[in-house]
Amino acid sequence: MSKQIEFNETARRAMEAGVDKLADAVKVTLGPRGRHVVLAKSWGGPTVTNDGVTIAREIDLEDPFENLGAQLVKSVATKTNDVAGDGTTTATVLAQALVKAGLRNVAAGANPIALGAGIAKAADAVSEALLASATPVKDAKSIGQVATVSSRDELVGELVGEAMTKVGTDGVVTVEESSTLNTELEVTEGVGFDKGFISAYFVTDFDSQEAVLEDALVLLHREKISSLPDLLPLLEKVAEAGKPLLIVAEDVEGEALSTLVVNAIRKTLKAVAVKAPFFGDRRKAFLDDLAVVTGGQVVNPDVGLVLREVGLEVLGTARRVVVDKDSTVIVDGGGTQDAIEGRKGQLRAEIEVSDSDWDREKLEERLAKLAGGVAVIKVGAATETDLKKRKEAVEDAVAAAKAAVEEGIVIGGGAALVHAGSALDSLRSELKGDELLGVEVFASALSSPLYWIATNAGLDGAVVVNKVSELPAGQGFNAATLEYGDLIGDGVIDPVKVTRSAVVNAASVARMVLTTETAVVEKPAEAEDDGHGHGHGHHHH
């Protein structure tokens, strides 16, 4: 396929146009008075959403050079979403402002590399300042406030706050679809750990990129599983039982893995393979915990249990298993209450006698996993479209709440960024030339999220930004009430992790665009003589 190349200014201009198109589509959703965007899907009904990353994912531009810019900004949104689960619109708006101001300076002769370095230094300084100014979050009420801001729904906020307090900060909160119209919270016995599926082919729900197994069997295996003849006899028995299978082992590889994958693709046997978490003795101990929770046995040749000889009797069970790329949650395992209580007692006794802090901490983590259970938020709605949107909102809210517990919160509404600008003063005195210019570019971009929150609320963005920059540190503009004041008191707060990710990711993408000298794209395949192409219509008949 032949390529098409653009250089310097032309390349950067086209990329900027793409950045603008994507950011303009997303930024109308910013803030409590943000609007919705309707996405027409190639199949199924249209989706209505106000979630930045969902909109960004749908956008592909016709002009290949503009599309490069759009895809770069899309990566800002997705990165921020992966780390913090929220803040994608803020990140997109920041990136747009940085690209705009940065390109103006490059066009005027600034050195893009130095400019980019200045932007990066400024981003780090602001990120540090945000972290330093964060307030820790502990109680259900403030966790609930974070979730309310994220989902724009007080009921959801309360449920998430309650869920997080019930299962503890290490506990697992999952989101399911409810069969009724109500959204409610259920706390069940369950256990989660930080290992996801070994292969993406195991995904069963493509929207959420998760593998969901209902009423599943669970195989726990101490060592690696690689040979197919070892696994096959058991697989055949599981297939006869007609139930999905979760495999937790040191690793699953080779023929064994490819057979599972082929079965998953053909849908002949629903199975998901996951690596057991931790190493060495901790891994052994955790597998034993899982055996207690699921009511199964760990298959281990050392105790005479050999994979190719065992039957269904060694398998545990679970009402539901949800696996994504980073984590596995087992809900309602088949282990008896007595066995689980016995195991907890044993762990507590070990904690008592342990003389090493590290061991004690790890034992306490295991106990928390066993005792914590899993909070399931069941989301209900009247229509399919509504359900999708609500479920997405609840998932974002849970992610935001977790981020808040991890690193604390800062004031929301774009105000924290405006106030964090003061952290750039020390850089201003030590940098010079185009690096200093980069810091100024960054300083000017910091107010862009607040500008759009105010604009979406129907006010003059510049006036609001000006006013907020004169307020003391904890104060800002509340776009829901259209008043200025103490935002933490009003519950207008963001997890600092979200705000920091937005700052860092926006800066890294802006640097990429600014330092682009050449853009190479596939030449679009064209119908004969329709006069498109990058020259934009040469045929003036």
UniProtKB/Swiss-Prot annotation:
Pfam families: Cpn60_TCP1
InterPro entries attached to this UniProt entry: Chaperonin_Cpn60_CS, Cpn60/GroEL, Cpn60/GroEL/TCP-1, GroEL-like_apical_dom_sf, GROEL-like_equatorial_sf, TCP-1-like_intermed_sf
Main location: cytoplasm
Gene Ontology process terms (BP): protein refolding
Gene Ontology molecular function, alphabetical: ATP binding; ATP-dependent protein folding chaperone; isomerase activity; unfolded protein binding
Reaction(s) catalysed by this chain's protein: ATP + H2O + a folded polypeptide = ADP + phosphate + an unfolded polypeptide
Keywords: ATP-binding, Chaperone, Cytoplasm, Isomerase, Nucleotide-binding
Cell compartment(s), UniProt: Cytoplasm
Keyword Phosphoprotein applies: no
GO cellular component assignments: cytoplasm
EC number per UniProt: 5.6.1.7
Binding-site positions, ATP: 29-32, 86-90, 413, 478-480, 494
Family classification: Belongs to the chaperonin (HSP60) family.
Record text on subunit structure and interactions: Forms a cylinder of 14 subunits composed of two heptameric rings stacked back-to-back. Interacts with the co-chaperonin GroES.
Free-text function comment from the UniProt entry: Together with its co-chaperonin GroES, plays an essential role in assisting protein folding. The GroEL-GroES system forms a nano-cage that allows encapsulation of the non-native substrate proteins and provides a physical environment optimized to promote and accelerate protein folding.
Name of protein: Chaperonin GroEL 1
Lineage: Bacteria, Bacillati, Actinomycetota, Actinomycetes, Mycobacteriales
